[in-house]
Structures are given as C-alpha cells and as structure tokens.
C-alpha cells in the first residue's frame, strides 16, 4: 500500500470517529445525530468532491453516485452545512499533515524543511455581511469586491500547506506568520526548518523573535530597510551589525519589544546581494551561517519561495477555490479549508507517485515527469470512489 493511501484511510477513520463528530458539532450535541438524507460523512464528502459546478448539479451528481434514487434540496443541504464547524477541514488537513511528517519519506534541504510564508487576496461573494467582516481592497469610486486575506505557510519541497488563516483583506502578515510558526511544531514535531519571506514581512522585533527562538530565516529586504547598512555593504555576502539606537527603538517605546531591543543594543544579520531574473539587485537578510550555507545556496533557497505563489494559483485555478457554494461566512470558511485539504491530499498522492516513478526510472537517461494539472484533474474525478468504497481490498485497487 502506498504511503498516501494509508493516510487517506486514516483520514476516513478520523471522519467517522466520535471525537471528530463532536468537533464538527461545535458544542451542539443535537447536530448530526438523527439519520438524514445528508449525514455528517456525506456532508464532508460532498465538500471534498466539489468540481466547480452549480450546487444543484454537485448535489445531484453526488447523490446519484452515493445514494441512487435519493435526492436532497439545495436549502436542505445548506441547512446542514450551517451546522458544521467551519474548522472541521482545518482540523482534518492538519491531522493528515501530522501523519505525513511522522513518515520518513518527506524531502528536506540539508536536513531542513523549506517553508515559505505569504498571503493572497481571495475574492468572495460581496454582501453587506462579508464586506463588514472581511473588507474590500477595491479602489475608491469602484464597486466594492469583498475579499478574505488568506495567510499561509507552505512547505515548498513537499508542496504541503502547513498553516492557513482567514483574515480581513488587510492584515499584518508578519504578525500572523509569527503566530503560525508557534503552531508549526504541532504538525512537524522537532524537524528543523528554514522560513522564507518576501518584502513586507521584516521588522527588527520579528527578527529578534525568530533569533530568540532559534528559527532560521531568509527574508527579502525593502531598499528602505536598514538603508544605512545596505548602502555600506562592501561585499555581496556580509555579516552586518545593526545598532538598535533610539531612532529604531522609538516606535516600540514602552512595549516588550522596545525593552528587548534596549537590552540587546544590537543584532547581527547576514546580508546577501542577489541578482533577480528581471535584472534588479535585491538584498536578503538571514541568520543562516556562512559555513553551512554558501551564497549561491541562499539565492537558491530564496528562489524556492516561488512555490507558494504556484500553490495559490493551484488553489484558485485548478481547484477553483473562489467558486463558493454560498454567501454566508461559515460556508466560505468551510469551502476554503476543504479546498486546502484537497490540495494537500492531491500533492501527497502525486509525491508518492513521483517517488515510485523515480525508482522505476532510476537507470534511464530521460526520466518521465508527472503532469500536476492532469493528476489533480484525475484525482478530483476518482477520489470520491475511494471515499465511498467500504471494502478495504477494493479501496487498495482504487
């Protein structure tokens, strides 16, 4: 049995556990207790099986496959959805991830996971409620488009979304990333990692927080960040002392961050100049040692950050994240987290297949590559058969 298959079966077992059912009820003991046309497990399966069709067609196709001769109305279905804890799939994908990293088959770079933090605006149905709750990034004098600010931490080598939070469209990305990094050990345990961030994330307190916690990072600086120190660089890879003078502490005066900055007096950052493909010269700040990671490796690691951009594109275009089944905030969160779960599930299966193919093609000069787009399409069509199959032997064949 493939590793990913085993994890899918573990997910199904979790979905049917009393503990998970209680979590899905959000504290209401009466939810999902009566036998209905759409019990909890079917409710979860319909969300995993979304294909971007109208809700009426989605329900018709699912019921035809799972319960031939039985139908459910759109209002009846949405009534059941409104009872479901919006964090149900958040809990489920983190459970799947914990099992993934408990395995020894994941990829690392010099024994480190390579993680990227980034945010993306998600277009959601525009209603008075969603505008009030999440806001809009639309320009003045234009029709407002409600948006959720989705912030994620992504494992770029294993293509897994580790952390995700739905926020107002305008949110503090660094503050969120720090909260998410506090939770990451719950998923990966004590596996060391390097976090990569783009401009907009860095701040002196953030660097201090990460260094105090021994978190390794690579962050792209704006030209205005530590401008004096950047202008004084004489080498393309240089260790720089950042003096924490009054001008840098002033903004944090009277806060724990300000007190910590006064206590330290200065911090050391390694600044690395890199040339981007568009010809612009950028400066990266890192606490990785020069002996362990040379200049070209820092550049290589930073470019790996692009994987999170690809992940957002996959969520939006391949998995149709922005094609929501309703307008209520609880339905939006359910759709977002179920899509992230499906994305991680797809990548787990694809990675398994890639490893299997690598073993078969080990002696070939030209190795075959897995087409991710085709693979996700096949998975979306076939996954429901695995979920609905109750015979273990038939599941293994699927």
Question: What are the roles of these predicted feature ranges?
Answer:
Residues 52-66:
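Short, charged amphipathic recognition helices of the HTH superfamily
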Residues 1-53, 69-71, 77-84, 88-94, ...:
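Single, function-defining residue in the core of a domain
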Residues 96-105:
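A short, well-structured juxtamembrane/interface segment
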């Amino acid at each position: 049995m493939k590793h990913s298959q085993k994890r899918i079966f573990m997910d199904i077992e979790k979905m049917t556990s009393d503990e998970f059912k209680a979590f899905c009820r959000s504290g209401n003991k009466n939810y999902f207790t009566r036998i209905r046309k759409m019990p909890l497990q079917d409710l979860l399966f319909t969300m995993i099986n979304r294909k971007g069709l109208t809700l009426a067609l989605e329900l018709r196709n699912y019921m035809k496959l799972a319960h031939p001769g039985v139908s459910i109305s759109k209002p009846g279905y949405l009534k059941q959805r409104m009872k479901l804890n919006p964090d149900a799939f958040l809990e489920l994908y983190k459970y799947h991830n914990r099992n993934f990293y408990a395995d020894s088959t994941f990829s690392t770079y010099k024994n480190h996971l390579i993680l990227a933090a980034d945010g993306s605006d998600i277009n959601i149905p525009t209603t008075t409620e969603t505008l009030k709750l999440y806001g809009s990034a639309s320009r003045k004098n234009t029709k407002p488009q409600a948006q959720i600010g989705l912030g994620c931490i992504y494992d770029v080598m294993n293509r897994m979304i580790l952390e995700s939070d739905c926020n107002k469209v305008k949110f503090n990305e660094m503050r969120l990333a720090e909260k998410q990094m506090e939770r990451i050990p719950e998923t990966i345990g004590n596996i060391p990692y390097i976090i990569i961030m783009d401009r907009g994330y860095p701040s002196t307190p953030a660097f201090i927080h990460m260094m105090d916690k021994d978190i390794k990072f690579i962050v792209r600086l704006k030209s205005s960040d530590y401008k004096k120190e950047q202008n004084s660089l004489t080498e393309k890879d240089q260790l720089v002392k950042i003096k924490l003078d009054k001008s840098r502490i002033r903004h944090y005066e009277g806060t724990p961050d300000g007190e910590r900055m006064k206590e330290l007096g200065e911090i050391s950052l390694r600044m690395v100049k890199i040339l981007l493909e568009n010809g612009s010269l950028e400066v990266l700040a890192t606490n990785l040692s020069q002996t362990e990671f040379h200049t070209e490796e820092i550049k290589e690691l930073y470019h790996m950050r692009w994987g999170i951009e690809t992940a957002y594109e996959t969520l939006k275009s391949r998995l149709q994240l922005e094609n929501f089944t309703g307008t209520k905030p609880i339905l939006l969160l359910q759709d977002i987290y179920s899509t992230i779960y499906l994305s991680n599930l797809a990548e787990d299966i694809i990675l398994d297949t890639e490893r299997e193919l690598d073993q078969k093609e080990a002696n070939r000069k030209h190795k075959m590559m897995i087409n991710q787009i085709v693979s996700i399409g096949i998975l979306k069509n076939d996954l429901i058969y695995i979920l609905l199959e109750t015979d273990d032997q038939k599941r293994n064949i699927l």
